[in-house]
Amino acid sequence: MRVNITLACTECGERNYISSKNKRNNPERLELKKYCPRDRKVTLHRETK
């Protein structure tokens, strides 16, 4: 069962990326290091609802 998720920057809170994940394989919240255009650097992005 794949669901669409939004990834938000942990430093500025801006929602920069949209992705999908398999809830059966990854039930916990996804965390990835991605580029934040507002901060102009790579920051930790966390899955939001």
Swiss-Prot record:
Keyword Ribosomal protein listed: yes
Record's keyword terms, sorted: Ribonucleoprotein, Ribosomal protein
Residues annotated as signal peptide: none
A molecular function GO annotation: structural constituent of ribosome
Domain of life: Bacteria
Listed GO biological process terms: translation
GO CC annotations, alphabetized: cytoplasm; ribonucleoprotein complex; ribosome
Pfam (any one): Ribosomal_L33
PANTHER family named among the record's database cross-references: 50S RIBOSOMAL PROTEIN L33, CHLOROPLASTIC, LARGE RIBOSOMAL SUBUNIT PROTEIN BL33C
UniProt similarity note: Belongs to the bacterial ribosomal protein bL33 family.
Protein's UniProt name: Large ribosomal subunit protein bL33B
Organism the protein comes from: Geobacillus thermodenitrificans (strain NG80-2)
